[in-house]
Structures are given as C-alpha cells and as structure tokens.
Amino acid sequence: MLVGRVLEAAGTGVMWPVLQITVFSIYPLSRRGFAMGTVGMAMSVAPAIGPTLGGWQTDANGWRSIFLTMTVIGVVSLLAAMFGLHNFGSHDPSARADFFSVSLSVIGFGGLMFGFTNSETYGFTAPVTWGPMVVGLIGIVWFVLRNLRAGKRYREAVAKDKSALPQPPLLDLEVLKNRSFTVGTITASLAFFAFSSILVIMPLYIQTDRGYSATMSGLIMLPGAIGQCVSQFFGGRAMDRFGARPVALFGSIVLTLGTLGMSLVAMDTWIWWVSICQFIRQIGMGFLLMPITTWSLNCLNGPSEVSAGSSVTNTARQIAGAVGAPVLVILMETFAALHKQGGASAVAASIFGIQWALRISTMICLAMVLMVFFGVKGDGAGRTRDIISLRALRERRARRMAAN
C-alpha cells in the first residue's frame, strides 16, 4: 500500500508542474488568470466529489474499493494522454536528470515527512521520530547546497557561451531571489499548511466525536469542494480584471473568517455549521490560490524561470501540506490530553483539542492575510492590462538605451 501511494504521489507531482508550464507557455499574459482559473476548476472536480464517493464506497464495499476505482481512472487517463496529447515547443533529447539530487530529495523530504508522521504516535522524543527527521534535514541541506552550486556552474557556462553545458540543477533555487515569487510561494505554503490539516481534523470531529458515518462526513464536506471549484474559475477571471492583490486579499480574509467560524464547533453544534464554514473556507481558498500562484509565476522571466518556479512552488506547497496535518493533529491531541487530565470526558477533550487546533489554524491564516496585504504589490499585482503596458514601456526604454 505504501509503495502504491508513493507511485501515486510521484505521478501527481510530475503532472501538476507540467500543466502549469504548459498554460504559461501557450497563453499570453492577458489570459493566464483565466486559463489558470479554468485549470483550477477542473482540478477541483475530483476533490469535490471524492470525499462523498469515497465515504459511500467505504461504507458499502470497504476501503479497498476506492483503490480499484482509482485504477480504472488511471487507465482511462493514461489512454487519453497517449492518444490525445502531443508535444509543443522545443525540447532537448540529450537532457538528463540529476538522479543523485533526486535521491537526496527522496531521503530529505521523505525522512522529514516520515518523522512528522511518527510523531503523532510516538512523540518527538522517540528515536523513530527524531532519527528520520535528522536524516531528512541533512538530506535537504545537502540537496539545497548541491543545486545552488549546480545552478551557479550552469549560469556561468551559459554566460560564457560554452558549447558543452554542465548539467542544470534539478531544482533551480535562484528563483527565490525574486521577492514577489518568494512572497507568493510562502503565502501559498501557509494556505496549504492551514488548509490541509482541516481536511484531517474535521472528519475526526464528524465521525469520531459526533458519530456520523463516512458517507455523511463526505456529504458535509461536499459543498465546500464545489465552492472552491467555482471560486477558482472566477478567481482567475477576477485576477485578469482587477489584479492579484485585491483578489488574493479577499480570498485570504474569507479563508480566515471561515476558519474562525469553524473553531466555534462544540459537542452540540448544528452539524451543517461545519459544512457552511468549510464552504466559506474553500471559497476563500479558491480566490486566493490561483491568483497568488499565477502572479508569483508571472513575476519570473522566461520559460526556464517559470519552469523552475513551478517546481519550487509546488514542492513548497506539498511539504507545507504534508507537515501541516501532523503538526496540528499533534497540537490537537496535546490540548485534548491536557483537558482530559482535568476530568473531561474523552469526547469533550477531543473537541477541546479540535477547537484549539482550529484557533491556531486561524492565526496562521491571519499571518497569511498580513503577508498578502504587505507583500503582494509592485509589478504584477495590478490589473493585467496595466502589467502589459508597463512591460511594453520598459521594453521600449531598453531598446532606446541599446540604440543609443
């Protein structure tokens, strides 16, 4: 099962950056918000119906039936890709991946995630927790230093116009020197950190603490997923018209308010209050994620930087999402244990822990609002047509200076 999940994650990890690069290569700047919004809407269809179908399948046929369904979907997707997709643009058949860096990334990020996952069961003081985390951190540091050196050698060779170029870095971290891209990447990572943890915590509240079935849990979460599907589409269109700053600020505020409302859940809360708050949260997520991602990649120069930026931002978001769930679950269990020591029942202690985990998630969302307010500005944060006019003006000035 673990090997299967690794293969699933590897396939997904490859497809999403390639999809982003394709959109940025095909669509002009004036249409990228719309294109990314459409892509986001399509990518949200499965999360919209997945929990409901998964809950129904689990109740009816057991959890193994979910993987059978995924196998059928994977085969259909493979056939569609084989017969419906074709390459575009130039490509280099001689390009080779840096497999040593790939190994370092697997050891580094895998060890870190494995340690965080074990911390839920064994605590941070257990060797099975801190051991993999130490190995993972060493692997990540080695990976970063190796790719920084490889990037420096590659750029020096390109600048000297050498015929034989050295191997490019697996992950070009130089894009993080772009302030706007870094702000966008951190903002999206915070959103994933705060958001993914709720997808773990709230089913525990619905099923374990309130006693509802897995199917009912999926139905409660369904409206939010549909809301994100729609809001990502309109968020992309709104970015083209109004710019990234107002749309992302609106989305981050809505996400914060929804998380704050969800932190008010109690033992006797109307169960559909969870659905309403999750709907509000995912509306905010849709209006935040696509505009901030599109804006941060728009601030990079050329296809090579966009390709590197897409890989970096997706890596950062996946790490944040993977770390966010175990960290907040650990905090939830810690608060629950403290409350239980005071004489509370198991259910009351669990809900107390969930409330505090959601309050911490609200604080993270508030930090994200401040980052958008103070960080999303300058070139690329305004309306798309203003960005195009500004870039055209800069190009004309550069041509005049070159002519003189």
Show which residues each predicted segment covers.
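C-terminal membrane-cytosol helix-exit motif in multi-pass small-molecule transporters
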Residues: 71-90, 107-118, 136-154, 368-376
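Juxtamembrane C-cap of transmembrane helices in multi-pass membrane transport proteins
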Residues: 114-123, 296
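Flexible interhelical linker loops that connect adjacent transmembrane helices
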Residues: 30, 78-106, 124-125, 150-179, ...
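12-transmembrane solute porter fold
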Residues: 41, 61, 127-132, 142, ...
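Helix-loop-helix hairpins in multi-pass membrane proteins, especially solute transporters
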Residues: 1-100, 268, 329
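Long, low-complexity inter-transmembrane loops of multi-pass membrane transporters
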Residues: 140-167, 389-404
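Interfacial loop-to-helix junctions that mark the boundaries of transmembrane helices
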Residues: 1-3, 7, 60-69, 96-98, ...
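Intracellular terminal tails of multi-pass secondary transporters
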Residues: 356, 373-404
